Amino acid sequence: MKKVYDVIVIGAGHAGIEAALAAARMGKSTLLTTLEKAGVALMPCNPAIGGTAKGHLVREVDALGGQMGLSADEALLQIKMLNRGKGPAVFSLRGQADKALYHDVMLRVLENQKNLDVLYDETTKILVKDGVAHGITTLENGEIEGRAVVIATGVYLNGRTIIGAETNSSGPVGFKNATHLTDNLLSLGIDIRRFKTGTPARIAKDSIDYDEMEVQEGESDIGTFSFMNDGNLYSQMPCWLTYTNEKTHEIIRKNIKRSPLYNGTIHGIGPRYCPSIEDKVMRFPDKTRHQIFVEPEGRDSDLMYIQGMSSSLPKDVQEEMYHSIKGLTHARFIRYAYAIEYDCINPLELSSSLQVKRIKGLYSAGQINGSSGYEEAAAQGLMAGINAALYVDEKPPFTLNRDEAYIGVLIDDLVTKGTNEPYRMMTARAEYRLRLRQDNADLRLTEKGFALGLATEERLKKMQERREEIERIVRLSETVKIKKENGGIFERYEGVQVEKTMPVKEALKHPGITFDVLKEVTNAFSEFSKSALFSAEVMIKYAGYLEKEDAAIRDARRLEEKILPEDIDYNALSGLRIEARQKLSKIRPATLGQASRISGVSPADITVLLIYLKTAK
């Protein structure tokens, strides 16, 4: 191939797809390379998009002009709002997706995207000259020139699947793995480590006793992922809930020496927040049962995904423990659970733009950066694709702060703190989560996406109309009154007596009073959409907390605005402790704010850096 591309993306999983689409939509000639067509947008583990904090990421990717939310909506089987009892900051959409349909939808999007070519071939080498990436070498097509390269190889680098004593050199689901690129990355001086993840068995749907399980229905009035879609999902498929029991746990304990996780076969580090069933049983011996969700893999699929039963135990043990569970007594295995080990890079090698610090024009996104999850991958892929396109145009990188998006928290955590295990996004990681709700992702990010040339004019207009609608609701809430004679709603929904007339805005400060409740006493808000009413209600109800968050954000930004020179010699700053010098020299933070978040850098060290910046002027 002789064509010179602006951007080359390696890997067509959730990160690679977003990276390639972002670059192409920003007008860059883009090549997406991947091992095989069947692996495009593959969902090798759970048949779901979203979840706690992950739903926020999907909404943010969508708000910026990414693809995951739109494609997920086309493939939805069921959708739910998680964390309803914990407050609006952590409300998170989670949708069951038809795996085959999601693959088909993404393939169609890629094939129809202007400026984008797709090549099915293995990348063996990143071409680098004088510290600058300038293309790739592939197994069958040789050298391909490119001005920027994005690595998004997922779990395919030297992938090895493990079931008991059986090990296979392969990617997920028995797909081909990539066996050449790791050596090239090592030769470029990039720090490589070995991580592990796993997946449960897939069971034939006609072999499950559903009557012995608890049915789990979706919700049909909560909208979907993309801000571009206004409707609800009415035709939904159920999931089911069952539990492990003492017999299950005894089978696991009896066979624990045959577990690759416990007998030394597996060397990779696994995810803390998605442990295998044997790990859960051994780590939490006091728990008498663990939740197991049985989820469909597609409308026309014969496979059911057994969430919560990830394992690498031998096949005979898997059959015994699955058959001990209510509803799975006659379960027929289509695919056994397995663990997979893979190579990934130390994310401390990256800057906040996801560019490899030592190689200009080389970016990295997704599970190769040590993260886990489809949504975390998509978010990184989008940002890497944006920044690769900006790099080609010789424009400054685009980054998001921790107070602007969960995407900002995710990337800052990876490149500042690093990770010793597969990193999972959680709401607890975000300091400003009341400001970073999933319902306002469009208000926070769509203008930024439009300025980049990524979000469309139609998307921008839709966001502006929704923002104006929210502002009208807030203004109206100041003038519409709840009359004294309607005070009974406070007694019904709060158990308190209120005997005075008050504006709706004041009434909403009461925890039990919502716009939904207020329908009983006023129709002044009947013209407004449910999503706008929810966003306005949160703004009104939590105004005091939001003001406190804004003050904290202003304080944090003072440190973020203080830029640290790239060539600063930390070893020459005598006031810094040895650990701080070592960490600062390795990570080379861009700002004082980033430096303050590095493990091992104390407030006293930050004071030393502040003094240095003042005297250096």
PLM feature spans:
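An anion/pyrophosphate-binding glycine-rich loop and adjacent beta-alpha core
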Residues: 36-38, 182-319, 416-511
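Extended, charge-enriched "interface" segments that sit outside catalytic cores
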Residues: 429, 446-605, 611-617
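Beta1/beta-strand and adjacent pyrophosphate-binding region of the FAD-binding site
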Residues: 2-15
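Internal hydrophobic alpha-helix adjacent to the cofactor/substrate pocket in enzyme cavities
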Residues: 377-398
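Conserved N-terminal/central alpha/beta ligand/cofactor-binding core
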Residues: 4, 21-125, 140, 152-172, ...
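A glycine-rich dinucleotide-binding beta-alpha-beta segment and adjacent secondary-structure elements
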Residues: 305-371, 399-412, 529-583, 588
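Conserved beta-strand-loop-beta-strand element in the redox core of flavoprotein oxidoreductases
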Residues: 127-143
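Short hydrophobic core segments
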Residues: 10, 143-154
